[in-house]
């Protein structure tokens, strides 16, 4: 699932970790704030270091009863096939993280 702010590129849901928050707590908060998805079991996947940011990447399994909806500053929220993300107008870290996940999942299959 990717999100986009008004007139912006697609990106993975996320944001800044607040003071006193763990990366896991921030991931839960950002997922809820940006997509309305709550109560998910998040699993830490990896840390990805971009040019100016450190990205803590989590996996979440979203059940059929949870339909993501764009919230707050997010204008669009959409599911994409993992192998189609590279063709999107998306941030470089988003494309790289998805590529790493895709390659890892393909090797496991």
Name each region found by the language model.
Residues 107-109:
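Acidic/histidine-enriched, glycine/proline-rich intrinsically disordered or flexible terminal extensions
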Residues 46-85, 93-105:
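Active-site-adjacent beta-strand/loop module that shapes the phosphate/pyrophosphate-binding cleft
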Residues 17-18, 84-86:
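Short histidine/acidic/glycine/proline-rich micro-motifs that form metal-
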Residues 1-12, 39:
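N-terminal strand-loop-strand
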Residues 18-22, 74, 92:
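Residues at secondary-structure transition points
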Residues 2-4, 35, 74:
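Conserved short hydrophobic patches within well-ordered secondary structure
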Residues 3-4, 13, 46, 59:
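Residue-level detector of conserved, well-ordered beta-strand and adjacent loop positions
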Residues 12-45:
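The catalytic Nudix box helix
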């Amino acid at each position: 699932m990717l999100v986009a702010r008004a007139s912006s590129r697609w990106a993975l849901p996320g944001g800044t970790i607040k003071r006193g928050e763990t990366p896991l707590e921030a991931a839960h908060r950002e997922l809820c704030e940006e997509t309305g998805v709550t109560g998910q079991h998040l699993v830490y996947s990896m840390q990805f270091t971009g040019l100016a940011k450190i990205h803590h990447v989590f996996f979440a399994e979203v059940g059929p009863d949870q339909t993501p909806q764009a919230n707050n500053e997010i204008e669009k929220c959409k599911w994409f096939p993992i192998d189609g993300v590279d063709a999107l107008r998306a941030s470089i870290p988003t494309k790289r993280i998805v590529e790493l996940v895709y390659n890892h999942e393909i090797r496991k299959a």
